[in-house]
Structures are given as structure tokens and as C-alpha cells.
Amino acid sequence: MAISRSEVEHVAKLARLKFSQEEIEEFTVQLSKIIDYVNKLNELDTENVEPTAHIVPIHNVFREDEVKPSMDRDKILMNAPYKENGCFKVPKIIE
Amino acid sequence: MKYEAVIGLEVHAELLTESKIFCSCTTKFGGEPNTHVCPVCLGLPGTLPVLNKKVVEYAVRAGLALNCTIANFSKMDRKNYFYPDLPKAYQISQYDLPLCSNGYVEIEVDGKVKKIGIKRIHIEEDAGKLLHENTDGSLVDYNRAGVPLIEIVSEPDMTTPEEAYQYLTKLKNILEYTEVSDCKMQEGSLRVDTNVSVRPVGSTELGTKIELKNLNSFRAVQKALEYEIKRQIKVLEEGGTIVQETRRWNESKGITEPMRTKEEAHDYRYFPEPDLVPIIVTDEWKEEIRKSLPEMPHHKRERFIAEYGLPEYDAKIITSSKKMADFFEKCVLEYDSPKTVSNWLMGEFSRLMNETGKEIDEVPVTPQMLVKLLKLIDNGVISGSIAKTVFEEMFGTGKEPEVIVEEKGLKQIANENELREIIKKVIVENPKSVEDYKNGKEKAMGFLVGQVMKATKGKANPQLTNQILKEELSK
């Protein structure tokens, strides 16, 4: 296996996904297959190849430092399921 | 066994751009919650970030001022973690190709110069602010999300809390000089995290490091490090081991305590940001930015010595803050005695700033007002000691010096007849001292002058007082 069960559990946790035991088993097999397939790329010699930073060969796309009006707050909060005092409301975060 | 500490610092500084790093929202501090936001800084689907050119220029400027190598090729990366202050669930930052690297800052401790290495400076976006008020949830204000930051990571070159303090002071000084950040800790535009570990003296292996957070001032950094180093040494001496963790400085208790962290795994899964293209800083661009660098502290210090004839000590203190140096130069423009101005800045001005914890630009006294005060002394309107009282009032209220002098009746008594009457009275009331003086006790003179000052509440002109007193006593 290219990936262990605990690695799958770890990745799921980082992505805040919850799976049943059967699903974890199934994904471990499937993800291993995918990784094995992609691993084929490791057979290539990339010694003198620059790592790709971006697939489009352009650089330095900038904007000037100019302020433009922000969006109306009512619009900003329109789709928020919970809001209070002009803020987005989320489950209590304890520091 | 003797132990030594190994300290590294991470400093986040907000850049003084007008607009955010990837969108055109304002970076102004404060404002009603969520009024400085747009679909881009909220990370709404379908939006694309575009990098603010000034962010690159400011970061390069800071890098040059901190003796860094500027990368010719640099790129942005995504740092992934879930926390409600981060609307996209990732922060756009830089991972393996930061804009600046391998710099240094020179600090002075116990008269010796020490170089503190700067590992890297990278650009990134700030997160929003969480408000934990009296509600059943937490509230999020994204005004700060997307404000440009530079993160300056030092090498673990410091061994004492004092060195850490000196490093921060110097770093802040340079950043202020380069005008890329206003470095206001109370507004969060300068934030400090520190890593510290201890090891037996002579050991080359690093101990387990502890990250310290919630450091709201440079003094807090110093105190937290002092506490933490003692704590770690005690644990080791008792045969325990240090567990890697993040600890929070509790200012009121004066201790560090364990803190829950954002992402348990510290597994940020960085990858290149596909929405932004690489940054290339050509030599021409770099030199253009270098030319825009303002005069740095050590150059200014040398100039103040040469141009204004300030003693080295004065020049060093005055240029230790750009704001103070600017204030000084504005005064000198209208008042032709640089040393007098520097005396006031290092004396009364600094004393009151230390007492109130205010910076020079937060004080209502302007250079023009200080100059007016100095001229009042020169013209004999008030005495030097009364001027201190007037200055304190100016510092507290922002009133013009002549208004204060008028309101409080602090004008110097320079009228000869008026002063002579007061002196005559003092002589009659102090026959013992008068006799002592006539018997050759010089000290008695000082006492009598003191009595005159007391009678006039310090308003007597000192030269005139001396002169008349001598005349009257020799009668």
C-alpha cells in the first residue's frame, strides 16, 4: 500500500471529513492505487528541470495601490446563515 | 550544570499600503465590522486575487534595509488550515521561495556589537478578527483580512532576553525609517512571536523549543523569555523533559501557560497558489527601490553630528526613532540652537513620554510649540524651571505655551523695583543667613536666592535676583 490507513484518517481529519470504518478501508485502497499511478512520474529524471511554479508562463501581474469602495455590508452578510452586530457568527471558539 | 538559551523571533509587520494585498479594499484600522470587505478578500467563489505592486516594493525595501538578498524569482503559496478568521480556509503566503533572505541586524549589548541573522522575509495576507463577546457564538470581522503583512523570521542567534529586546527595538527602528510600516503594537500592526529553548552551555544540539504568544510589548517579550528560560531550566534540573508546545504569556500573573493551538498537526499542506503568477524582481527594479530608501539611522546619526554639532550620545538617542529625528529637524529649522532642542527632547520630553507610554506623534506638542516655548525662555518671559511646568501642561493639554503662561500667571518677574521690594523683605525675614553671608559663608547666598524663588513661586528672573541681592547685602 502506498498510503496507510492512519494517513487516510489524518488527511480526513485535516479536511474535517468524517468517514465510517468501511469507507476508510475503501479509500485506503483507492488512494493507494491513485498514488501508485501518479508515482510513475518518479521514473522520470528531473535532475535539471526547474520546478514549475505556475503552468502559465507569465509573471508580474500586479495592480496599483488604489482604494476602491468595498461592498455594501448588507449584501456581504446576505448569505450568512448566522450574523450579529454586523459580524458573521460562528460556533464559539475558545482560545 | 550551566544552561544557555537559544532564542528566535518571528515578527509580523503590517505594510503601510492604502489598499489590501489582493483587492482594492482600504487597509484603514478600525471602521465598523465588515465594512472594508469585498468578494475577493472574503474568498467568495469565482473571485481572483491580483497582487498589489506596492506590497512587493515595500517588502523589498524592508529587505534591502535589513541587508537581505532579494530573490530574483519568487512565488506565492497556499497555507491550509481551518479557522474562522480565515475566510478561504487557506492563507496566501510564501513557502519555499520568499522575497528576501539571508539578512542581518546589528545590535549592541554591553558595548559589544552582535549580528543577528535574518533568515527570511516573506509577504502574506492578514487574517480577520474574532470577537468573543457575550454571545453564544464567536463573531468575525473581516476588515483586517487581506491587509498586507511581511513576516520577518530571525535566525536563532539570540541567547538572552536582553538581546531579543535590543533586536526588536532595532528592527522596529529600521522598519519605521524605511516607512513600510507604522509598527504600532497597540493597533496590532507589529506582532511578535518567539521561540525559545535551553541547552547545557557548550552543547551544540538544540533543546526542545517552546513557542510563546500573546506578547503585547517588547518588554512583555523580554519578561516572558526571562520567565520561560527559568521554567525550562528548572524542569531539566528536576530531571524532567520539555514538551514541544505553544504557551501564552499571562501579563497579569507574570507567567507563561499552555495554550490550545489552531491546527493540532501543524500540517499546513503548502502548495503553489494557482491564482497568482510568479514575481520577478529584476536588478533594475531592485536598484530603483534601493534609491527610494530614505536615510537610514546610522547615516542620520553621522549627519546630525556633522551638521548640527550634536554630541555622539545626543545624536544616537535622537535618531533612535525616526519620528523623534524628524521632530528635532523641524525644531532646528526655526530655532538655531540644536543642542538646546536635543536637551529638551532627551530630558523633559522623553521623561513624560516614558511616564505616559506615548510615542512622539501621539503627544499634542508640535515642533512649533516647543520652539515657541524655547523663545519664551530666551526672551526672559519665563525662567528655565518654570518652562518645565509650562511644558508639562502643554504635553497634557496641547495648549500653546504663551496661553499657559498667561492663564497661570507664570510670567517672570523682571521688573527691578518689584523684585527689589521682595528681596528686601526676604533680607529682613532672614537675619541669620544675612549675617552668615556677611561672615563669608557663600552658601547663605544660595539659601537667600531660594527664599526669593519661594516668595515669587519660581518666577523671579535668576540673574536679576542675584544682582539685586548682592547690591542689597552690601549696603
UniProtKB/Swiss-Prot annotation, chain A:
UniProt keyword Membrane, yes or no: no
Any Pfam family matching the protein: GatC
GO process terms (BP): glutaminyl-tRNAGln biosynthesis via transamidation; regulation of translational fidelity; translation
Enzyme's top EC category: ligase
Catalytic activity: L-glutamyl-tRNA(Gln) + L-glutamine + ATP + H2O = L-glutaminyl-tRNA(Gln) + L-glutamate + ADP + phosphate + H(+); L-aspartyl-tRNA(Asn) + L-glutamine + ATP + H2O = L-asparaginyl-tRNA(Asn) + L-glutamate + ADP + phosphate + 2 H(+)
The protein's Enzyme Commission number: 6.3.5.-
One annotated GO molecular function: ATP binding
Keywords: ATP-binding, Ligase, Nucleotide-binding, Protein biosynthesis
Family named by the database record: Belongs to the GatC family.
Oligomeric form and interacting partners: Heterotrimer of A, B and C subunits.
Database matches in HAMAP family: GatC
Function: Allows the formation of correctly charged Asn-tRNA(Asn) or Gln-tRNA(Gln) through the transamidation of misacylated Asp-tRNA(Asn) or Glu-tRNA(Gln) in organisms which lack either or both of asparaginyl-tRNA or glutaminyl-tRNA synthetases. The reaction takes place in the presence of glutamine and ATP through an activated phospho-Asp-tRNA(Asn) or phospho-Glu-tRNA(Gln).
Name this protein carries in UniProt: Aspartyl/glutamyl-tRNA(Asn/Gln) amidotransferase subunit C
